[in-house]
Amino acid sequence: MLILASASQSRKKLLENCQIEFIQIASKFDETTIQEKNIFNLALELSFQKANSLSENIQNLSLPEEFNYGTMEILGCDSIFEFKGEAYGKPSNKEEAFIRWKKMSGEFGFLHTGHTLIIGNFDSTSNIFKITEIIKKTVSSRVYFSNLEDWEIKSYVDTNEPLYCAGGFALEGIGGKYIEKIEGCFSNVMGLSLPWLRENLYR
């Protein structure tokens, strides 16, 4: 069974919509400890560390009975938006969100989501989680933004939605109407590439 090592509601909803059985446990890994400058590699490393931090503490988690035996998969993800070579995480305030959207209006950027799937077996008797395989990949999607007036940007920023999203926008939320088109995996822009997960979870 699957453990989602993330507090993301978007990823949770994607899994629920696909009727994938899982439980959600947020990773407590400190992201500031990673100094990788390459955005593509950074997303991948953060996804691994999130999944790995859970795998190392699996014996201390309160898991349902069905997780006490057999195969377990721990999924870690991290999304970073890249705009003209610069990494855009979550805006720190409304002013920063507005400035970013002014720059992104009529332009495009890349949403990189690092994926790590740690597969193993947990023996509840010995309290040992034995890793059998680690699968990692960063999936990238190109996001095109509409040309927006200042009042549209302000109206969106005032909803506070941009403050909780990598890149300052949510495709599945209010921000979806400001996205012109997507090239690449659609669900990846929401934080999880479902085609990648299907390929690696059920092989």
Curated annotation (Swiss-Prot):
Domain of life: Bacteria
Coiled coil: none
Biological process terms in GO annotation: nucleotide metabolic process
Localization per record: Cytoplasm
EC number: 3.6.1.9
Disulfides per UniProt: none
This protein's UniProt keywords: Cytoplasm, Hydrolase, Nucleotide metabolism
InterPro entries assigned: ITPase-like_fam (IPR029001), Maf-like (IPR003697)
One Pfam family named in its UniProt record: Maf
NCBIfam families tied to this protein: maf
PANTHER family for this protein: BIFUNCTIONAL DTTP/UTP PYROPHOSPHATASE/METHYLTRANSFERASE PROTEIN-RELATED, BIFUNCTIONAL DTTP_UTP PYROPHOSPHATASE_METHYLTRANSFERASE PROTEIN-RELATED
Listed name of the protein: Nucleoside triphosphate pyrophosphatase
Organism (species): Prochlorococcus marinus (strain AS9601)
